[in-house]
Amino acid sequence: MGAAAKLAFAVFLISCSSGAILGRSETQECLFFNANWERDRTNQTGVEPCYGDKDKRRHCFATWKNISGSIEIVKQGCWLDDINCYDRTDCIEKKDSPEVYFCCCEGNMCNEKFSYFPEMEVTQPTSNPVTPKPPYYNILLYSLVPLMLIAGIVICAFWVYRHHKMAYPPVLVPTQDPGPPPPSPLLGLKPLQLLEVKARGRFGCVWKAQLLNEYVAVKIFPIQDKQSWQNEYEVYSLPGMKHENILQFIGAEKRGTSVDVDLWLITAFHEKGSLSDFLKANVVSWNELCHIAETMARGLAYLHEDIPGLKDGHKPAISHRDIKSKNVLLKNNLTACIADFGLALKFEAGKSAGDTHGQVGTRRYMAPEVLEGAINFQRDAFLRIDMYAMGLVLWELASRCTAADGPVDEYMLPFEEEIGQHPSLEDMQEVVVHKKKRPVLRDYWQKHAGMAMLCETIEECWDHDAEARLSAGCVGERITQMQRLTNIITTEDIVTVVTMVTNVDFPPKESSL
């Protein structure tokens, strides 16, 4: 075969391969089914059109379980741009005995039929008789195979480069490799599918994602914020960190190469979002305020507590260092849970607390001693800083409560009325340290027995004297008593109770531990 003929044939092969790899239908439909359609408020079954970016491929998928020989479908629908699904016309699960079966394919309604064919190890026969081949067969084989391999490698390399460039923004080259991903309960399970960005913060963004038939939250850190990701993972991995009022941790993973790398933290997903977002759109009743405040206080009290002798080890006391309404999440029943441990400090016996740089956190929630740079670097000092911030979060709740006989304010952040939405460190020092101002407690709040008690508790949380502040456990007990007391008070009793508010038998005032 002449050189010109070989070149022409190679060009033909490349064009054919490009068409096979890059060519695909602009529209695709998949069979849709959702076993949890009532909970998710979707149709149970139907046909789902697949949408997505033009440069992304669209697939269909199916997940099912085999329960004692009975097939139970979990979900069917569209699946977006997964390399494991490329050029599969049939929906076939090949992994050996998975807990949940999963397959994906390309083509309209290709997930209507699905099957399970585990890959079997093929044994080589002891003898393999060679059949004679014509002499020109070897010439074609040795000529075409290298050309096809080269063409395939070039096309695949171009596609991977183009796809990767669009999928990931450029990041700085790290001075240190973050090392292998930590052990994760997610390893070995089906891949996550990112659905939508729910929040953006200082250390990355939070996605709503789907893991098989449940939603999870994925917090994605760029490599520059490796320290925050590592710290949060280490705190979640401490003994005793499973608690109703602390965000449930699922796993941590590293995605990408050593240069283009993202660090993932996977947790439970709560549709109501943060307390801040909830208060922007909703007012709360007295009972709702008490439930949110009590569960938030119990979560912080558990975080602050040093608990030896647990089954999985010793839980140290932990200071959050960034308590704010954005870092308190609400479950569907308005139970609060504490989130975001990127700045948290753990206090283990005989060990340094690590980087104890004082001025960290969100400016408007910084305690006076933090703003002054006059922190006593002891455990209790850090716990009292958390309690100052908790007082501000309680004020946010009070400002949106309907219990008092008066207007409910529009939602505002602490000190937003005094300083605005973007205070500088100097602004906060002037207002909080020098003028000793705090957010306004409305006069008409005092006319409601429970709100009057809450105002007193708030003032004791944000006291200028750190050692005079309440502990989180004490706040939780007080709120329980407030709710119990106000639920048995009649309208005629309110005036009497308000005059006696300072004599209520509250739990004894105590410091942060």
UniProtKB/Swiss-Prot annotation:
Topology within the bilayer: Single-pass type I membrane protein
SMART domains registered for this protein in UniProt: S_TKc (SM00220)
Entries under Pfam families matching the protein: Activin_recp, Pkinase
Bilayer-spanning residue ranges: 136-161
Enzyme Commission number: 2.7.11.30
CDD domains recorded: STKc_ACVR2a (cd14141), TFP_LU_ECD_ACVR2A (cd23631)
Extracellular topological segments: 20-135
GO terms, biological process: anterior/posterior pattern specification; BMP signaling pathway; determination of left/right symmetry; embryonic skeletal system development; gastrulation with mouth forming second; male gonad development; mesoderm development; odontogenesis of dentin-containing tooth
Single GO cellular component term: cell surface
Stretch forming the signal peptide: 1-19
Keyword tags: ATP-binding, Cell membrane, Disulfide bond, Glycoprotein, Kinase, Magnesium, Manganese, Membrane, Metal-binding, Nucleotide-binding, Receptor, Serine/threonine-protein kinase, Signal, Transferase, Transmembrane, Transmembrane helix
Molecular function terms, GO-annotated: activin binding; activin receptor activity; activin receptor activity, type I; activin receptor activity, type II; ATP binding; BMP receptor activity; coreceptor activity; growth factor binding
Localization: Cell membrane
Function, in words: On ligand binding, forms a receptor complex consisting of two type II and two type I transmembrane serine/threonine kinases. Type II receptors phosphorylate and activate type I receptors which autophosphorylate, then bind and activate SMAD transcriptional regulators. Receptor for activin A, activin B and inhibin A. Mediates induction of adipogenesis by GDF6.
Membership in a protein family: Belongs to the protein kinase superfamily. TKL Ser/Thr protein kinase family. TGFB receptor subfamily.
Name of the protein in question: Activin receptor type-2A
Taxonomic source organism: Mus musculus
Lineage of the species this protein comes from: Eukaryota, Metazoa, Chordata, Craniata, Vertebrata
Gene it is expressed from: Acvr2a
